[in-house]
Amino acid sequence: MTKNLPIRLAAGSGPTFGVDDLACAAATHLGCWEEEGLDVTWTPVHGGVAAMRAVLDDVVDVSYGGLGPVLRLASEGEPVRIIVSMARALAQNLVTREGITSLDQLRGVSWALDGFGALSHHMARLVVRALEIGEDEIDWQAVGPPPERIERLLAGSIDVSLIRVEEAAALNSDAGNGLHTLLGFAELKDLVPVQPHGVLATTEAYERAHQDELHRLTRGMIRASRALNDD
């Protein structure tokens, strides 16, 4: 029996997968990567910037996170490479405190992010730009992954955040928590048609030395996407 090749991945999505991360979740839990002969281990981190930093520090081999951090590192001269893309849109809602009922009221709000430069930051900046609100009119706060952002929203110590659709639905089902969805998935897609999205990325050195592993990783993602489409 051939031994599976090991590969270490950092999950910028944190310890859990959301709707945005369905392809990665499917590849992991449906055994798509295992079928390609890979032994994948995940390390959860807070955001795409941390995921790429883990790659550059040789803590992991491949990052899963937003496109933005990879492009930024590449523009700064870091030897990074994108392997495969996940999707072309984010399954998120803009959740706000109950008192914020119009888009004009977003000026001056505190807005929770995974971290500065993370996918949630990139998408939030695009939303603000589309609404013709200056970035300096927002109190940006790096809070952490969705559970931490939701906790801050519920505590009333933050005004606004982009939250996964399934988590937003759970919040909306509780009429007494003081929160509501200001912009849903379809409205955000109309507002920002071209959205940042998740990618798998690595270093140029790893790409040169481990092409077989990366080919298998990509084929596993294709398997997962087809399985989701067929379901």
Regions found by a protein language model. Name each.
Residues T2-D136, W140-V143, A155, D159-V165, ...:
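Short, glycine-/small- and polar/acidic-enriched structural segments
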